[in-house]
Amino acid sequence: MEPAAPSCNMIMIADQASVNAHGRHLDENRVYPSDKVPAHVANKILESGTETVRCDLTLEDMLGDYEYDDPTEEEKILMDRIADHVGNDNSDMAIKHAAVRSVLLSCKIAHLMIKQNYQSAINSATNILCQLANDIFERIERQRKMIYGCFRSEFDNVQLGRLMYDMYPHFMPTNLGPSEKRVWMSYVGEAIVAATNIDHALDERAAWAKTDCSLPGEFKPELCVLVGAIRRLHDPPCYTKPFLDAKSQLAVWQQMKAIESESVSTHVVVVEALKLRENLAKAVQETIAYERHQYHRVCQMMCNNMKDHLETTCMLARGRTLATLADLRSTRYNLALFLLSEMHIFDSFTMPRIRGAMKQARCMSYVERTISLAKFRELADRVHNRSAPSPQGVIEEQQQAGEEEQQQQQEIEYDPEMPPLEREEEQEDEQVEEEPPADEEEGGAVGGVTQEEPAGEATEEAEEDESQPGPSDNQVVPESSETPTPAEDEETQSADEGESQELEGSQQLILSRPAAPLTDSETDSDSEDDDEVTRIPVGFSLMTSPVLQPTTRSATAAASSGTAPRPALKRQYAMVHTRSKSSENQQQPKKKSKK
């Protein structure tokens, strides 16, 4: 318990024993750092309390060679009663001596009380700092235990294997036998081994988070800085003036020999002594007021700010650590879910996908706050993407698409009046070339009863035209190395005559048009190939085109054999080329002249 502020009378009755007892009382109320406070912080606080107390002037400097030994009981009684002799104009040597001794004793006691208040203020600041350090590190210890308990219950004790053990029944394929289940579980163990690096990285991050949440490294230097700041803030008011005034007055009395001189009245000495004692008491009161109120309030305010900072830091660290814990738990759960989801689709690509994803996620587990399930699957897709079609599947799809396209083309019914495309015409010519030629004797005479005979004869004429290509009006006839025989010339003439008679008898209007000139590439291909491919002229028109007669293989075969034709799967068109007799006669002499 701190002593009350002294008055003038308290200074008069104080003695050395009471002052020493008060000092021992201050030492008994000291607060010391606990074991939780780090050693260097505790030493810093205790050293600040043992520093030399500020002393502007020592008692010897203030009182000089004056004797300031303890007074006797009789002298104490006289000192306490000197105020009763203020109006005494006589010269009482005993009273004057008691007044001078009271000034000396007041200076001694005031100096001791000021030093004691200095020490009390420093001890109080040291106690505040020790209590602050104890509170801070006790709060940090509670926070550490709380965070460690959270990690232990929600992360350390819930390892990857434990998670997968709790979750694997939901992901095991249902169609596995006992032996297959054992094989599947062995592969699950391999997947856990592949993910060990990621799990260790999560454990390391958890250890870092635990270290950050303990916060001793942050508050150790801050406490040391606070101790030095509080010690430097101790700046009590100056107390030297009343002591110097007392010293000068004592020197005057000594020079005047006021105690022995009869000329110096008791009234003058007593009044001056009471005035000096009052000034000393005021100095002591000011010092006590500063130490107990101003300096103590400043120390308490700084320590409270430190406590508020501690609470704020602890809350932020707790939130940050719990957020890290949630991220680590989420990453570990996503890792277990990824492994089991991959094992659920158990094929030859499962283990390569898992190993590749674990290698790529190794660095991410240290850098990223959390790794989602989608990220794990994305890393696995970089190794092998199950959703992407395989090369064999692409080939099969292309083949299937080709078959469907061919089937659609077969199902299309062409309009008889629609001219064939160039590609279809080439395919039809090739099919016509592959068909065996119909025998004229079996097919019957020209212009017979049946309707298939004109189509058969037209096909034979088309084949003869292909076997014996003839140039158009604008085309140069190349010289042939083979010379036709007379028998062939006669057959050609008879066939042309029969064709002209048949066309005249059927009353069909055929508008002949000269064929378009062929390009150089077509001329070259005609010269190189043995078989001529019929092409659509450049100036083609339905009104001036050759007659299109639909024919099929079944119809041709039926016409040659005399049987009924089978239904055709696809319409085929043959170009019926008509030549005038004059052009044939013009070409025939050329061949004969060549011969």
Curated annotation (Swiss-Prot):
Location, primary (coarse class): host cell
Sequence ranges of Polar residues compositional bias: 469-484
Keyword terms, alphabetized: Early protein, Host nucleus, Phosphoprotein
Stretch list, region Disordered: 384-595
GO cellular component term of the entry, any: host cell nucleus
Compartments where located: Host nucleus
Ranges that cross the membrane: none
Comp. bias (Acidic residues): 402-416, 423-443, 454-467, 487-502, 521-532
The UniProt record lists the keyword Hydrolase: no
Ranges annotated as biased composition (Low complexity): 392-401, 503-512, 550-567
Functional summary from the UniProt entry: The IE1 protein has some additive effect on the trans-activating properties of the IE3 protein.
Protein name, as recorded: Immediate-early protein 1
Gene (UniProt): IE1
